[in-house]
Amino acid sequence: MTVGTALPPPELRNCPAPAKLNLFLHVTGRRPDGYHTLQTVFQLIDWSDTLHFHRRDDGVITRVTDIPGVPADTDLVVRAARAMQAASGTRFGVDIAIDKILPMGGGIGGGSSDAATTLLALNRLWGVNLPREELMRIGLSLGADVPVFVFGQNAFAEGVGEELTPVALPDSWFVVIHPRQHVPTAAIFSDERLTRNSPISIVADFAACTNKFAFGRNDLETIATAKFGEVARALEWLKNYSPHARMTGSGACVFARFEDEQTAQRVMERLPSEWDGRCVKSLSHHPLATFA
């Protein structure tokens, strides 16, 4: 915190942590450390967890919400707060509450987005005012998908996902289906059938594509649909309404883009009852983008 500046109020409530879609995802190689190199475009969408923060003066960091299957000490939001505390040298702590809406293991970045919202919110709540690049560096130490949410806009990503270039995307509506099946990321990336040699694209290739939602493919899709039957069935069903429907991330969510809300809602009305679905609008920027 800059000397002489007043602290903001002690609470930040209703902080969104929006989901993302991977419009395509190409696996281009594997590094000696085991991480895969990727190319993808991240599309932010208006479907969010909501986080609430209360500043503490004793330096203690707690998650006050119970999340089944996610111990507080290993939760990315707690790890993000601790990393932010260490990087900034602040004396403050925080109580964090989470309204968890986004499905875990869905490929839409829920945990990573929660971590990024924590970094952005604490940057404001603690008055530390770290630059965005520093928050992105902290985010990368937590997970490869965290930096794009801190980056704050739709982006063409390379490396392990941390080399980001902003891209302009048209306003869109999406149907996102979660087939109520958890897909562990490690189970997909460790599969021996995964191809890891997709040709390198450049951002100009994507920018020049007239239908950006038909560009490329998701290299993880064939593995996920072979291993997880509900993912395959949901994708096959959605392709009846959009030939360019595809999986996001390593699954389990699948999505399709539509020109308008009415068309997307008509598809949603036909959704089989055994799956969960959502009609969502695209975002051009993260709701907390100005916090860094």
Swiss-Prot record:
Active site: K20, D145
Pfam families: GHMP_kinases_C, GHMP_kinases_N
Pathway the protein acts in: Isoprenoid biosynthesis; isopentenyl diphosphate biosynthesis via DXP pathway; isopentenyl diphosphate from 1-deoxy-D-xylulose 5-phosphate: step 3/6
Entry keywords, A to Z: ATP-binding, Isoprene biosynthesis, Kinase, Nucleotide-binding, Transferase
Enzyme Commission identifier(s): 2.7.1.148
GO molecular function term, any single one: 4-(cytidine 5'-diphospho)-2-C-methyl-D-erythritol kinase activity
Reaction catalyzed: 4-CDP-2-C-methyl-D-erythritol + ATP = 4-CDP-2-C-methyl-D-erythritol 2-phosphate + ADP + H(+)
InterPro entries: GHMP_kinase_C_dom, GHMP_kinase_C_sf, GHMP_kinase_N_dom, IspE, Ribosomal_Su5_D2-typ_SF, Ribsml_uS5_D2-typ_fold_subgr
Keyword Transmembrane helix: no
Source species, domain of life: Bacteria
GO biological process assignments: isopentenyl diphosphate biosynthetic process, methylerythritol 4-phosphate pathway; terpenoid biosynthetic process
Binding site for ATP: P103, M104, G105, G106, G107, I108, G109, G110, G111, S112, S113
Family: Belongs to the GHMP kinase family. IspE subfamily.
PANTHER family noted in UniProt: 4-DIPHOSPHOCYTIDYL-2-C-METHYL-D-ERYTHRITOL KINASE, CHLOROPLASTIC (PTHR43527:SF2)
Role this protein plays: Catalyzes the phosphorylation of the position 2 hydroxy group of 4-diphosphocytidyl-2C-methyl-D-erythritol.
Protein name: 4-diphosphocytidyl-2-C-methyl-D-erythritol kinase
Organism: Cupriavidus metallidurans (strain ATCC 43123 / DSM 2839 / NBRC 102507 / CH34) (Ralstonia metallidurans)
